[in-house]
């Protein structure tokens, strides 16, 4: 089974490939020219479906829908003391500060927001919605990772807000954990695991 991801983000591609070793996984730019997808949804699920449907439509235009399934991920971090922000805007949280938001600028803004609340830490959780589009229709799953954010960056293994997030039951940030541990506890892995159950069923008729 071949799966095209609705992303060319090397970190996400690496994580998904590590989880789905039994499938042929391709980044978006390996199959088609990357194109802009406007994430206009109001939830992780809506945005994940917007992305995966846009990619699957391109597959149909390329007459590849019988060869590929499309998979997308929309994820982010929700911080309690900030009312759930940055949430679905996690990847572009600092777009009011810089023209092109980066992981670094997003983390800097989150730390600044914590300091404005006069706190160094807050309960938080990651959410990931995994969406699949294929001949059989659309399917979605969710994964969560609960813990807390801190106002400093620690570690060098990860991306996004990993360096300032500590999962429940751990004393190290996600950025300080090894890959195997991350794969076991991450929100994305949990969502991918649930999606793997759906993929196994679909694989029988694909």
From Swiss-Prot:
Cofactor: Mg(2+)
Binding locations of Mg(2+): 74
Cofactor binding notes: Binds 1 Mg(2+) ion per subunit.
Domain of life: Bacteria
Reaction equation(s) it catalyzes: XTP + H2O = XMP + diphosphate + H(+); dITP + H2O = dIMP + diphosphate + H(+); ITP + H2O = IMP + diphosphate + H(+)
EC identifiers of the protein: 3.6.1.66
Key words, A-Z: Hydrolase, Magnesium, Metal-binding, Nucleotide metabolism, Nucleotide-binding
SUPFAM superfamilies named among the record's database cross-references: ITPase-like
List of residues binding substrate: 7-12, 75, 159-162, 182, 187-188
InterPro entries in the record: dITP/XTP_pyrophosphatase (IPR020922), ITPase-like_fam (IPR029001), RdgB/HAM1 (IPR002637)
Name of the protein described by the UniProt record: dITP/XTP pyrophosphatase
Protein species of origin: Campylobacter hominis (strain ATCC BAA-381 / DSM 21671 / CCUG 45161 / LMG 19568 / NCTC 13146 / CH001A)
